[in-house]
């Protein structure tokens, strides 16, 4: 039987420890391998990010019979995963494809991992998908920071802020229109 998820319970703390440990280990080891091996690891992380984000909604909807409205990849963490995955797979890397996941993903994925909205613990598939998906975002961003040596540029912060606001306006409007507000 699958136990209920307990926020900051033993299972949650262990999963966080493993997640962050794997991220640190991959980033550290990748700094001591050849450039050709770094390129292979970069591609593997990028393919894993994109593959997981593309397959996840289909798995939830068609295999686990979850409601499609809930599992469409229309949130900032999914956008972050797509962007950092594309960034890692591109030959000419677009700085904004690094910076948007840096600002959205690090804060969002860290907060999501620290305070997940889960009802069941391991070995529930949603538990695995949640920690794997958000952990990958952090891995992609920290790999770009520590191994590929990319850094966010302060002059691009305002562009990132405008893109964020433009993405949030329709989402907020749609959310407000979808729910009846009390008079």
Regions flagged by a language model, labelled:
Residues 1-22:
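Hydrophobic transmembrane alpha-helical segments in integral membrane proteins
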Residues 17-21, 73-83, 101, 131-139:
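Membrane-embedded alpha-helical segments of multi-pass membrane proteins
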Residues 32-42, 90-97, 148-157:
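Membrane-interface helix-boundary motifs at transmembrane edges
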Residues 43-88:
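A glycine-rich, hydrophobic loop/mini-helix early in the fold
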Residues 49-58, 105-116, 165-173:
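Aromatic-anchored segments of alpha-helical transmembrane domains
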Residues 61-68, 92-94, 116-128:
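Membrane-interface helix caps and helix-loop-helix hairpins in membrane proteins
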Residues 84, 137-153:
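Alpha-helical transmembrane segments in multipass membrane proteins, preferentially the mid-helix core
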Residues 174-183:
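Conserved small/polar residues in nucleotide/adenosyl-binding loops
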């Amino acid at each position: 039987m699958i136990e209920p998820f307990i926020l900051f319970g033993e299972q949650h703390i262990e999963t966080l420890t493993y997640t962050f440990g794997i991220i640190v280990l991959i980033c550290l080891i990748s700094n001591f391998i050849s450039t050709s091996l770094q390129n292979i690891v970069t591609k593997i992380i990028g393919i894993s990010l994109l593959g997981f984000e593309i397959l996840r909604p289909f798995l939830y909807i068609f295999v686990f019979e979850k409601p499609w409205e809930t599992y469409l990849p229309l949130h900032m963490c999914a956008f972050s995963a797509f962007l950092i995955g594309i960034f890692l797979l591109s030959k000419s890397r677009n700085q904004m494809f690094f910076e948007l996941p840096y600002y959205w993903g690090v804060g969002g994925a860290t907060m999501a991992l620290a305070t997940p909205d889960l009802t069941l613990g391991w070995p529930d598939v949603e538990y695995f998908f949640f920690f794997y998906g958000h952990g990958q975002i952090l891995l992609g961003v920290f790999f770009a920071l520590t191994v590929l040596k990319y850094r966010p540029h302060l002059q691009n912060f305002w562009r990132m802020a405008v893109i964020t606001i433009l993405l949030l306006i329709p989402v907020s409007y749609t959310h407000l229109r979808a729910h009846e507000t009390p008079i």
